[in-house]
Amino acid sequence: MSKHYEIQEIFLLKERKIDMANIGVFDVLGPIMIGPSSSHTAGAARLGKIAKTVVNKPIKEVTFLLHGSFRETYKGHGTDRALVAGILGMSPDDPRLKESLAIAEAEGIAVKFLPTDLGQVHPNTVKLLMTDCDDIRWEVLGSSIGGGMIEINEINGNKVKITGESPTIITCHDDIPGTVSKISTLFYENEINIARMTLVRSQKGKDATMTVEIDSKVSDDIVAKIKAVDGVNRVIVINSLGGN
């Protein structure tokens, strides 16, 4: 990473007011991985892996819009191979990561990389434009913020905040009274503790997106009950990436 981007990343961390006392030594050193950079390799693989989880179907084509230092160094630092490895479901320490481009081609997945400017975002940011096996299009915007840590900021244009450090439930639902309360009650009744919850809506009475980070995984039965709540249109489940 160039000195310019290192300085820029330091300033961004300060702006985010990250509590350095809560960042451990392994967050600083980064995870076990294949490749030269925790931000450009491990973080990139995690971004791709979460995007695959969001789609939750075979992906037949993906375009990576690369911003900032991703745009400048994606070949030399292996970001291209790491992103594709994530789309294939690989973890940062998977030895097959180096061959991910060839593996994707063999599996019939069309891959394209487009350097671009995504505006006022973190320098290690990528937008993934994906098409699944049913020809449904998906967009995921995320950043690798250092030490292998990541943030997903948008899914299909909806604002979210996903770190991948905890199991996460995302609901896309109608903005009607009682929906959030009913979902929260399901967590309470099943003794599932909520670590963090965020809710955004496009406008009053229209579409809303809720992101809930929880302390434990949820069963398929609970997910089915959430899907059955009046007004819920889609439920996305992201299990913790943990060390991977």
Q: What residue ranges belong to the model's regions?
A:
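A conserved regulatory-domain signal marking ACT and ACT-like small-molecule sensing domains
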Residues: F113-T116, V140-N244
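Beta-strand segments within the central parallel beta-sheet cores of soluble alpha/beta enzyme folds
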Residues: I59-G68
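Short glycine/threonine-rich loop-to-helix capping motif typified by GTGT followed
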Residues: T73-T79, P123, T209-E213
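Acidic-glycine-rich active-site phosphate/pyrophosphate-binding loop
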Residues: K14-V25, N56-K60
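C-terminal edge-of-domain segments
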Residues: E105, A110-W138
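A structural-propensity feature for long, helix-poor, extended segments
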Residues: H67-A102, A106
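Conserved phosphate/anionic-ligand binding catalytic regions in large, soluble enzymes, centered on
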Residues: G30-G48
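Short, Lys/Arg-enriched N-terminal segments with co-localized hydrophobic residues
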Residues: K3-D19, G242
